[in-house]
Structures are given as C-alpha cells and as structure tokens.
Amino acid sequence: MDPNTVSSFQDILMRMSKMQLGSSSEDLNGVITLFESLKLYRDSLGEAVVRMGDLHSLQNRNGKWREQLGQKFEEIRWLIEEVRHRLKITENSFEQITFMQALQLLFEVEQEIRTFSFQLI
C-alpha cells in the first residue's frame, strides 16, 4: 500500500471536516462518510492481496466480493461527480485546492482498486 495515498486520505478527510465546520460550507457528511468507507475498503483489498495464500476463502466469497467491488466503483463514480460539482460551485481557494486533491486521490484509488482486484481474480 502506498503510504502517500494513506496520508492523502487523512489530509483530505481532515480538510473536509474543517470545511464542514466553516459557516460558508455546505453539509459534507455524505462525502466524508463515503471517503472514509472507500479508504477502509482500499486498505482491506490491499491486505487481501498481501495475504494471497488465503485464496480459498476468497473464492468462496467471490460472488459477494464481486458485488461489493461493483458497488465501490459506483461509489467512486458518485464521489468523482460530487467533488467535481463542488469544485465548480466553490469560490473559496482552500476548498478548491481540497476538492482538486480529492479528485486526484479518487482517480488514483480507483486505479489502485482495479489493480488489486485484477490480482485477486
């Protein structure tokens, strides 16, 4: 797992939490919750790749695993659209930087999850 991605997640979540506390920002609960969920999922997928000796149990759960994977890709697409939308409507430079970094992170994580999933299939 890339330590830069982990610190990027933590940094962006911290920034979004600060933005949420700001009087001018809209409610970011859904975005923050999905970001946290995505981080946990990415981390667990990475751990599964590291423990590839556990393939038998993974194959037993394969149907459910594929369904979860599809759901995560839908969540990533929703997050990308939501972050793009917020980037377009915000005029605050701190928020713009945060959303641009969040967008970049989402693209990186989407690629990482694709790579992990191909290794597990």
UniProtKB/Swiss-Prot annotation:
Effect of mutating G46E: In strain: A/Fort Monmouth/1/1947-MA
InterPro entries xrefs: Flu_NS2 (IPR000968)
Outcome after substituting L34Q: In strain: A/Fort Monmouth/1/1947-MA
UniProt KW keywords: Host nucleus, Host-virus interaction, Transport, Virion
GO biological process, one term: exit of virus from host cell nucleus through nuclear pore
Short sequence motif named Nuclear export signal, residue ranges: 12-21, 85-94
Pfam families on file: Flu_NS2
Signal peptide positions (record): none
Listed Gene3D superfamilies: 1.10.287.230
Cell compartments where the protein resides: Virion; Host nucleus
One cellular component (GO) term of this entry: host cell nucleus
HAMAP family: INFV_NEP (MF_04067)
Assembly and binders: Interacts with protein M1. May interact with host nucleoporin RAB/HRB and exportin XPO1/CRM1.
Family: Belongs to the influenza viruses NEP family.
Misc: Average number present in a viral particle is estimated to be 130-200 molecules.
Functional summary from the UniProt entry: Mediates the nuclear export of encapsidated genomic RNAs (ribonucleoproteins, RNPs). Acts as an adapter between viral RNPs complexes and the nuclear export machinery of the cell. Possesses no intrinsic RNA-binding activity, but includes a C-terminal M1-binding domain. This domain is believed to allow recognition of RNPs bound to the protein M1.
Protein name: Nuclear export protein
